[in-house]
């Protein structure tokens, strides 16, 4: 099959990319603004970190139900509903005056963001053939790291010059713009069904009950390995990403704007790396899980180098290296999710794996905060996570794909 994208495919991929991008801009807005808001509202570092944890609690509650809903009622409804809800909750963050109120809002933001990734991956599975998915998912997943670049590119600047409330209000407007685009471009189309025939063989049926769906994803060896891998790898990625601004400001004593600029470079490196590795994976014979294991293993030394950077000028080198290490594996692992799942269970499978991803992302800030409390050192806290990508790489090497 021709590997180039049609105009329709390009349109749907752009919309999915923007939707997932904004889900990360909403998520990361707090990480970018945390040093400023903590000071303005007199929050402790642990209170600020608990806002990250609250988001992941809410997110983890809805990733699996979101996948089930996308399989049964369609990804279009999931995407449109999430965009509107994310805009409302993020706008309300501008009204936070108490710790408890903000904590509830962050929890709600996690709940309404949870269904997005599963719905988008299901849409990619329908609209792109097996030979196109590495590139498509690579482009799609670039939005997560680009979200780091986007939010750090404007949020600290707006907060410093116009107030942190205005930064949240501007952030809240963005999903509404994409909502109107999605109304016209996101369609439920069962594409490339003939080319997917070999992927459906062995499932035994076209439609599964809720119990059968959960039983399948909970007992499939490849899916379970992907899930546990995600706990270690994704947890480390987002633990590092959400804590990096605080580390730079508190440990290296740089300004919030400088930290935002460094994290923008971090994100740009990941943006370039993701579609590049996806493009490569579509054109080499090495199985995707082995390629993913290699790039995930490299995440560990990249994190150690970043955590041991003492000269702020060296961050221009070590931050992009970390950005590539932290994100390059994700297009490959998400393409493997689509490949490992029957077409009718792609949303459920993505939600199941993402549930473990978010448990990891929920656990990582707790580990970081605990180590920080015990040692008083942000550097040691980051280094404590460096073993996790190695464990993830080992698990990826055990996957067996047809």
Report residues per predicted region:
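Juxtamembrane intracellular "pre-TM" segments in multi-pass secondary transporters
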Residues: 1-6, 190-226
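Extracytoplasmic
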Residues: 11-45, 240-245, 364
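Extracytoplasmic gate region of multi-pass secondary transporters
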Residues: 30-31, 221-267, 274
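Conserved MFS/SLC helix-loop-helix module at the cytosolic interface between two early adjacent transmembrane helices
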Residues: 61-100
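Helix-to-loop junctions at the C-terminal end of transmembrane segments
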Residues: 63-74, 274-286, 372
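Structural signature of the two symmetry-related core transmembrane helices
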Residues: 77-91, 289-304
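Cytoplasmic helix-loop-helix junction between adjacent transmembrane helices
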Residues: 105-146
